[in-house]
Amino acid sequence: MAAVPTRESLPYRDCVGIVVFNQEGDVLIGKRKASGDPEKSAQQGAPWQMPQGGIDKGEDPLRAALRELHEETNITTVSLLAEAPEWIYYDLPDDMVGVALKGKYRGQRQRWFAFAFTGKDGEIDVDTPGGGKHKAEFDAWRWEKLTRVPALIVPFKKAAYDKVVDAFGDIPQRFTHS
């Protein structure tokens, strides 16, 4: 019987997080689909989050952000606004270490990017992103105030989302005071 790995023995998974602002300065959030995955199951009480995903080996983080955004939402019409000044980390809760994230990671190390959505809402497709080429990760989406998002996500990601708000909190004013 294999021993359950300890938090200290596991690395962080390199990922990207994506903040998409619409013309009103609100951000895109998606409601996670229910599944048997322990991490996703833990999110059923607070299933909303912004798009995010893993960085492939050798992949540039900005390229990964654009790829993940398309794979999860079908969005391609964006322009880069900003990149968070540093990596943002979150740790899995103790009962999920060695189980969630395929049991290989203690949490995630995320590089966050902010984009302006320059398309129309009809471009957004979380049901069959990429024309059905990508597995749906969300079953609903909506626009929300950036400052409200940390209260809508799972508690173990809240501190990371607070840092995202700190990094990009001035961006909504660019839309409302330009």
Model-identified regions with their sequence ranges:
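N-terminal strand-loop-strand
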Residues: 2-50, 62
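N-terminal non-cleavable signal-anchor helices
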Residues: 5, 20, 133, 155, ...
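Hydrophobic (often cysteine-bearing) scaffold residues that line and stabilize catalytic clefts
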Residues: 12, 61, 157, 161
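Unchanged
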Residues: 54-155
